[in-house]
Swiss-Prot record:
The keyword Cytoplasm applies. ATP binds at residues 121-127. InterPro entries: Folylpolyglutamate_synth_CS, Mur-like_cat_sf, Mur_ligase_C, Mur_ligase_C_dom_sf, Mur_ligase_cen, MurD. Keywords: ATP-binding, Cell cycle, Cell division, Cell shape, Cell wall biogenesis/degradation, Cytoplasm, Ligase, Nucleotide-binding, Peptidoglycan synthesis. The gene is murD. Cell wall formation. Catalyzes the addition of glutamate to the nucleotide precursor UDP-N-acetylmuramoyl-L-alanine (UMA). GO terms for molecular function: ATP binding; tetrahydrofolylpolyglutamate synthase activity; UDP-N-acetylmuramoylalanine-D-glutamate ligase activity. This is UDP-N-acetylmuramoylalanine--D-glutamate ligase. It comes from Mesorhizobium japonicum (strain LMG 29417 / CECT 9101 / MAFF 303099). The lineage of its organism: Bacteria, Pseudomonadati, Pseudomonadota, Alphaproteobacteria, Hyphomicrobiales. It catalyses: UDP-N-acetyl-alpha-D-muramoyl-L-alanine + D-glutamate + ATP = UDP-N-acetyl-alpha-D-muramoyl-L-alanyl-D-glutamate + ADP + phosphate + H(+). It comes from the Bacteria. Its main location: cytoplasm.
Amino acid sequence: MIPAASFAGKQVSLFGLGGSGIATARALIEGGAQVLAWDDNPDSVAKAAATGIATADLRGADWAKFSAFVLSPGVPLTHPKPHWTVELAKGAGVEVIGDIELFCRERILQAPTAPFIAITGTNGKSTTTALTAHILKSAGRDTQMGGNIGRAVMTLDPPKPDRHFVVECSSYQIDLAPSINPTAGILLNLTPDHLDRHGTMQHYASIKERLVAGSETAIIGIDDSWCAQIAERLERAGQQVIRISKRLPLTDGYFADGTNLMEAVHGRYSKVAFLEGIGSLRGQHNAQNALAAVAACLKVGLDLGEIQSGLESFPGLAHRMEQVGRKDHVLFVNDSKATNADAAAPALSSFPRIYWIAGGLPKEGGIEPLRGFFPRIAKAYLIGEAAPAFSATLGEAVPYEISGTLAAAVAHAAHDAAKDDSGEVVVLLSPACASFDQFKNFEVRGEAFRQAASAIDGVKPIGGAR
C-alpha cells in the first residue's frame, strides 16, 4: 500500500466504496488523514464501516472542514450531470480528485525520479499496460502495475527511485488527476466512447490529451485524426513527442512494417524489434500496442535485447485474442472481451480462415461494420439473443447455424474446423456482444469457452494469462 502522506493531519471526504474506493480510503488513513466516506449503496457503506472506515451521509457533512474530496472514477463528474457530492464539493470550494491524483502526489513527495509510465486510449490500454510491465519485469526491473487494469493504484508498493510504475488510466481517472505527470505518457488512439459521461468527442479527447500533455515524453499513436492533432499541438508547444503508427511509415518515430517494428530518425530506418511468431501479439492492433511499449521501455533505459526478450515471452491477456488450445491444424482463440463490433474487428482481421462464434446480448449497430471480414469466415455459429439479427446480416454472404448455446457452438465449430484441409484454421470466440443474456460477464463467458475447447478430445492447452 502507498500511504497518502500528502494529506496527513487533514480531513478528506470520499465517495464510492467499491474495491478501489475502500483501498483509497485505507491509503489516506494510513497516511494520517481523517476520512469520512459514503456511497449510495448501503451494502458498500456497511462493508467499509466493518473495516474501520468512518462513514456518514455527506449531505449532512461540514464541507468547509475538508481539504479534498476523493471521488470514485465510476461516478459522474460533469455528464450527464454532476453527482450531488460533486456539487457540494464545488459549492464549498473543495478540490475534487481521484486515486490516480493521490498516487501522483505521493510519487512527487517520496520519489519524483521513479519511472512512471501511464497509458490511455480508447482501445488497447490493458494489453499495452500488461506488455510494458512484462517487458520491464522480464528485464529484472522492480515493476508495479495497476490502475484501470484491475489493481487499485494505491495498493501498489510505495514509490522509490528505482521502482517502475506502469499505470493504465481511463478517461474518468484522468479527469480526476489534474497534476498527472508521467515519465512517459502513452495515448494509443481515440474513437467515440463514453460520450454519455463526457458529452462530446471534443471533451473526451481533451481529457485524454491531459495525460500526454503532462508527461515528460508523449508517445502518441497518430493513426486517427484526433491523436494526430494532439501530437501536432503538443510538439508546437515544445513538448517531446514520439509518434507511432501501425500502418504508415514515418519520417521520425516508430512504425510497423509487417511484423517488424521500425525506428525512423530523420527518414533513416532501423529495425528495433520483431513480432514474427509471437502468438500473443498477432495482428495489426497488437503492433501498435508493441510499438508503444517499445518506445516507453527505451525511454526508461532498457536495451533492445531486453525488449525483444520481453516481447517473445509475453503471455497475453485473458479473453483478448487469447490462444487457449490447439488440435492439429485447429487453433482455439478466446476473444470474449470483444463485446461490440469494433472490438471484434482486430481478431477477425488477424486470421485468414475463421470458424466464428458470435452473439449474446446485442449492441447498437450489430455486426454490419464487420462485413469487410466476411470473406475470412468459413462459417458462423450464432448464440444468444443476437442470433436472429446476426443471421439476417450474414444472409447468404457467410454460412451459419444458430447454435443457441456456447457449448454447442464450440462443439460444432471444432467438428467442422477439423475437416477443413485448407491449412491452419481458427475456432474464434469473438462475440461482438455483451454476455449478460447467458453469462455473468465476459470473463465467465471466456472461461466457458476455454473449458469447452479443452474438453474436446485431442485439444492441447496453450499456456497464457489466467
